[in-house]
Amino acid sequence: MTMIDLIISKLEREHLTALAELEKICFSTQAWSYKSLEEELTNPTAYFFTALVGGEVAGYIGMYVVCENCYVTNVAVFPQYRRQGIARALIKMAMLTADAMETDFISLEVRPSNTAAIALYKSFGFEQNGLRKNYYKNPNEDALIMTKFFKRE
């Protein structure tokens, strides 16, 4: 794998158009709109990070921190940037943020057919601890709930 010029930054307004396009590519009918993404800029419980490669938006991750709980809402990488460690860097940023905020856990949903994502999450210590029936559409699919618990003293 070649080295890439990767920067993980806080979501900025100038990233929204690219993220709305990425949402359509990755999530089609369940994609978040530009307006939905824009609302997260002022949501006090939302933490969204953008992956930039050479100044271009390559992907992003979004999460909510509520009390001592962290929920990942979205992880997406443009197809041309996949298999380059970008999703790994985004997950790592989310985990570092959640841990620094002393959350008890970080949780997410994933399609059972998304074996690459499942393997990535497992490599960070996430374990399946639930199932949401008929969660995804086009195609219809359940969602695996995966959680990583943080050890607190």
Q: Where are the regions a protein language model picked out?
A:
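Short, Lys/Arg-enriched N-terminal segments with co-localized hydrophobic residues
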Residues: M1-T2
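Acetyl-CoA-dependent GNAT
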Residues: K10-Q80, I91-M93, T97, M101, ...
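Extreme N-terminal starter segment of soluble prokaryotic enzymes
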Residues: D5-I8
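Conserved glycine-rich acetyl-CoA-binding loop
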Residues: E56, N74, F78-K92, M101-F105, ...
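Conserved catalytic-core motifs of GNAT/GCN5-like acyltransferases
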Residues: E109, K122, E127-A143
